[in-house]
Amino acid sequence: MGALRPDSGTCTVLGADSAAPEFLSLKEDIGVVLDEAYFPESLNALQVGGVMAKTYRRWDGKQYQNYLTRFGLPEKKPFKDFSRGMKMKLAIAVALSHSPRLLVLDEATAGLDPIVRDEVLEIFNEFTREEDHSILISSHILSDLEKLCDYIAFLHQGRLLFCDEKDRLLEEYGIFVGTADQVNSLQDGA
């Protein structure tokens, strides 16, 4: 969000060039969940909500409280004593409680147990049911991508190798698991 400058190329987010000064005003419209949740360890969930209420103009304390209840998060337990799953749920509650239009998820479900991951994926699906809501997700968990995404892009060493509709990829391509010799013996176009 302005901390890094691209070496080349451009990035447009919600219609604004990421290098343009007006891009900073979009921070209210973007919710971010990283692979690790970063909140002051001494704060509890209620205190985190208080800080966020001063950070975001559109902070919805009632919505935040609803997520805390839905996730079964303790309101007065210090963040440092949260499990990984609890930390991720708190980060998701924060990201969703200021009415973002775009969620940016960086390995947000990695390391979560399957039950928690399914619960989180359902919340992300609920989010995208709103027409003006989108998710940009970075994940190594292919089943998460299959459940959430309409389009799949593959980046390698900072380059976009392909971007296509998920359904087209599922229809036209498959996954082959084999030894190096088996892969080398495949015919071209197989």
Descriptions of predicted regions:
Residues 9-17, 25-26:
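Conserved ABC transporter NBD signature motif
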Residues 163-164:
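ABC ATPase "signature
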